[in-house]
Each structure stands twice: as structure tokens, then as C-alpha cells.
Amino acid sequence: MTGRDSASSDITPEVLLRAYACGIFPMAESVDDPTLFWVEPERRGIIPLDGFKVASRLARTVRSDVFTVSVDRAFKQVIDGCAAPQPGREDTWINRRIRELYIGLYQLGHCHSVEVWQNDDLVGGLYGVNLGRAFFGESMFHRARDASKVALVHLVARLIEGGFVLLDTQFVTEHLRTFGATEVPRRRYRAMLDVAITGAADFARLPTEQPIAGTRALAIISGREGLGRG
């Protein structure tokens, strides 16, 4: 289900949060399209946090800490990276208004980024929205092999440790299926969302001011480490 809103200037970050709580999110046709449209898929993409899969080769990369991973250090750079053309993805749905809205959510503490660095270069990352115990993944990018995958691994470890119960990917791609992504019908998704937005999670339960070792992220995902999660 989609609906176009030509008066996108009337959409505020607060309106956006209410939309997420109802299971809908905005997109644009292209970077040059000034309007937004609302989307509520018939089948919703999610990654079950207790079923997240990390391939052995990727696990070796994560464990090696060849990249440095940070959180909320370069949000605007990440959203710009996601908006830039990628191999196999020449067009983007992130227009100027989308960028403004999500920067607004970031300033309100409801949007976060995970950055992946190689030396001092930003080579990958992702961003998304948090509401209650739900996290809505918006977009990711990479400029080095496996950089966005490493960002996703660190995100999932943070969500598990922080008490989140829903990771919404909106849609499912073959790439996301390798991590365990699946589709659920709209009615089931709404029930999951209602539970997830009730209560609170802590995105900063793991430290945000210093990098987390890859071995620790993998241990959290596998259930071998905890900080007293209830």
C-alpha cells in the first residue's frame, strides 16, 4: 500500500515517528523528486534477532577488526553515502527532504548510524530509526568489501545487548536473506510492532564512545556474552 503526499514539507520528524508506530514509512521516487510517498508493504521484511546468521568468512573479517566501527560519529556522512550511487544501484530514493527528516530524527535521538572506517576513511555504514524496542533499518552502503556487512553485525550485537525485539528491514533482498531476513504478513508484522514499541530499549547499552571488538560483537550474537539482559 502506498500513498503520495505532495505536501511533504508538512511532514515533521514527530509525524515520521507516529508513522513508524503505525507501520508505514516514507520514500521518494528519486533524488530529484521533491515529494514523498508512504509505504506499507503487504509483506514486511524483518531479521529475527535470535536467528541472525553470520557466514564463516564474514565472521573472520569481523573478528580480525580490520575495520574500526563507531556509532553516531558521522551520521550525515553515512546518509550521504547511502544516497550516493552504488554498484548495481544507480538511483536513490533518498532525496533532500528524506535527508532533512532523518537528520531531524537523529537530533531527537531517534535515529542512529553505524560507521565503518579504514584508517581515517569512511568505507561503509548504515542508519536507521529506533522507537521503543524496535529498530527500523533504512539504508546501508559500502566502499570497501564487507564494510556494510560488518556494520550490520555490529548493529545486531548492539540491538541484542540493548534489549530490542524487532529489526525491521522493510523489504527483503537476496543479500539480506543470507543474514536470516524473512518476510511476514502485514497483520503479523503489526502485532510484532505493537509489542516492540511498548517498553524501552537502550541503543547505548554497549559503549558508543569507543569501538567494540569484533570478537565481543560475535559473542553477543551467539549468546556467549551478556551484561545481565533481562
UniProtKB/Swiss-Prot annotation:
EC numbers: 2.3.2.6
Superkingdom, taxonomy of origin: Bacteria
Subcellular locations according to the entry: Cytoplasm
Record's keyword terms, sorted: Acyltransferase, Cytoplasm, Transferase
Family named by the database record: Belongs to the L/F-transferase family.
A cellular component annotation (GO) from this entry: cytoplasm
Short name of one Pfam family: Leu_Phe_trans
Bilayer-spanning residue ranges: none
Reported function: Functions in the N-end rule pathway of protein degradation where it conjugates Leu, Phe and, less efficiently, Met from aminoacyl-tRNAs to the N-termini of proteins containing an N-terminal arginine or lysine.
Designated name of the protein: Leucyl/phenylalanyl-tRNA--protein transferase
Organism: Rhodopseudomonas palustris (strain BisB18)
NCBIfam families: aat
Keyword Coiled coil: no
InterPro entries: Acyl_CoA_acyltransferase, Leu/Phe-tRNA_Trfase, Leu/Phe-tRNA_Trfase_C, Leu/Phe-tRNA_Trfase_N
Keyword Repeat belongs to the record: no
Catalytic activity: N-terminal L-lysyl-[protein] + L-leucyl-tRNA(Leu) = N-terminal L-leucyl-L-lysyl-[protein] + tRNA(Leu) + H(+); N-terminal L-arginyl-[protein] + L-leucyl-tRNA(Leu) = N-terminal L-leucyl-L-arginyl-[protein] + tRNA(Leu) + H(+); L-phenylalanyl-tRNA(Phe) + an N-terminal L-alpha-aminoacyl-[protein] = an N-terminal L-phenylalanyl-L-alpha-aminoacyl-[protein] + tRNA(Phe)
Gene Ontology BP term (one): protein catabolic process
Signal peptide (residue range): none
Disulfide bridge partners, by residue number: none
MF terms (GO), sorted A to Z: leucyl-tRNA--protein transferase activity
